């Protein structure tokens, strides 16, 4: 799957999570035709569905769809084996089996709502058209060996707009209740108090005068790179003697003794 398409699918499923409460693993209702087409193309159904919804899945199939596969058991042995690995969704049509499209529609569309948060994978265009009128129903089908997730339907977009409009005028407590996060009044009061204290503290810090930073002057040269000064000969205060006198210092002057 291309990166751009995967990103769009991930974003779309995130919308279903926020607005309609979808959670992983997603419950994917698969009809008999979708199962048969993917099996003939030798496509791993569970892996393909997981890539499409960008998350873990729980594949499911209704009893009516199983009956349709068993009606052609000689031709669809591989499909029946795959269907047995799916979770069986009890539709309640025991006495009289319905067509797969009617069965899936009765399971998904409960009073105009997708109560059980099903993702529907079907090749029936009439079934997809009927389920587009129900808000919050992700629809999957295969076209040219590519499994496709339909964009959000008009009913889903309208429901999204209505919920966003309602949330704009809600208080903090009402938004938490709508999102399913129940918190006590004491916790909300503590949060409000913490917010107020942090705001006051920020205002106090802004009003306090800021101490001027001491500007650093130009740095001196590196002492290791300076050439050492040459030591000068220190002069003594002792007077210098002439050369002819220096040699006579310490020597006794010899006198001849005069004899009488």
Swiss-Prot record:
Matching SUPFAM superfamilies: PIN domain-like
Principal location listed in the UniProt entry: nucleus
GO molecular function: RNA nuclease activity; small ribosomal subunit rRNA binding
DNA-binding found in the keyword field: no
Record-annotated PINc domain positions: 26-129
GO CC annotations on file: nucleolus; small-subunit processome
Stated role: Involved in rRNA-processing and ribosome biogenesis.
Protein name: rRNA-processing protein utp23
Gene coding for it: utp23
